[in-house]
């Protein structure tokens, strides 16, 4: 599995994320994507030094802007049969990826998507107004696309590589998460959702 980890400057969170993910017993590679303009030189040097500890890590400068641009270059450079998309700032819980991989191994042609709305404990320090706005937006998306999932915009997923093969992300800001869910859906890929917890980042 190719694990894509975009980063700006949240280096301590990235280190913790890698430490947790590296314990998962699966053939994996880490693809760390950092910003040519926004990542500090000191952080870039630390990312490069991580290669000494993690031989299965490669780091790339993103070419197109925003998080969608980072994810896009990660997908292009992924070498494994499956692709995991997550954050390096701990807003996506790295402990949850092990279970997502287990489910993926039993459902080879499905997308495994983390879902904050399955349980009542999916949000931590999200803010009431933001919470309600997200709730309404997800409901509208569910009605519009007539699909059973509850969380269309949480970019914490595992994809079969062929679900994204040849696809270039068009919406580079936050809309990329919805875009790269809908594109495989149109190809007929099934989506399996698992409960996930979101926690506000403290870095980055």
Q: Which residues does each predicted region cover?
A:
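Short beta-strand/loop segment that forms part of the nucleotide-sugar
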Residues: 27-38, 60
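Donor nucleotide-sugar binding loop of glycosyltransferases
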Residues: 10-13, 39, 67, 93
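Short beta-strand-to-loop acidic/aromatic patch adjacent to the donor-nucleotide binding site
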Residues: 81-91
